[in-house]
Amino acid sequence: MEVRIINLEKKLINLKNIKKILSDKELLKFCRENEKFLNSYVRAKEFEEDFKDFSLNLYNSIIKYPNILDEIDKVVSNIVINKKEIGDKLLFLSELSNYNKNLDIIMFYGGFNDGICTYGDNIYYAMEWFINPDNINMKNDEIIYRYLKQYSINPEDIIYNTVIHEFVHICSCEIEDKSNPIWHLIEEGRAVYITNQLDKRDDLGLLMSENDLKWCKENEKYLFNEMFNVISENDENKYFDFISPRRNICGVSRTGYFMGYKLIETYMKTIDKLSQKEKIKKLLCTNETEVYFKTLRNMCL
């Protein structure tokens, strides 16, 4: 397995050209003509409105923060990624899951649309998430302000952590039954759990603030009772409140990632005789939900 790190900003396009574009139609045309830069969204061409929304995010963020491109350039210039270190961890996971494709980690600019995401067999990383928000005069009451303050302190650690997390999504078995939102809790939970086993840079691999994580630990029983009700009622909309970065559960965000981790951790204790490697392999090959629903129910008793 080969891991490549590609910087689209520096190698493929001068983003400042976007400033010259005035109309939505022209902007859409520009993005389509530069599909190498927008490779992560090539599939979205089939869905013009989605592609247009992404294009507008690019444009609007540049208008709102005029010096953002210069700040991104500084961030990219200062980041040093140890490709061997991260490649070794991804190779370990690929061998356990029998995943034999090469992986591109592509750095791009998403206009605060997506932070890090997977499309096909690649991982796409939006580098604007590592800007110090004070450097672009972002107001501290904006939702993403606190994330940027946290992520800009040590971008390399965040990249290592989240690339492992996203690769787990790529190389693991797809859960077959998606009729209930517990499938998503399992997917995020195993990604967080495996990341925590392989990389100890972040507490539990959750990328949560200290205060939010402290609150989750203190209110774990309440959270799981609420989650159990959501799962039992198959309330997908309410479930995604737990995943949201917008502080939807008692003023705390990303609670679902904490709960997914705890769900997987609790289940792992029932197979404690297995080695760490065997546990990770079992998680990567999980494609059913029933055993985790039983675990969730027992956590609420």
Where are these regions (language model features)?
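Surface-exposed patches in mature extracellular/periplasmic domains of secreted proteins
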Residues: K101-F108, G205-M208, S275-K282
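Amphipathic alpha-helical surface "interface" segments used
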Residues: D114, D212-N219, C285-E288
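Acidic/His-rich structured neighborhood in mature extracellular/periplasmic domains
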Residues: V76-K200
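An acidic intrinsically disordered interaction segment
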Residues: I153-V163, D212-D235
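Pan-zinc metallopeptidase signature
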Residues: F224-L301
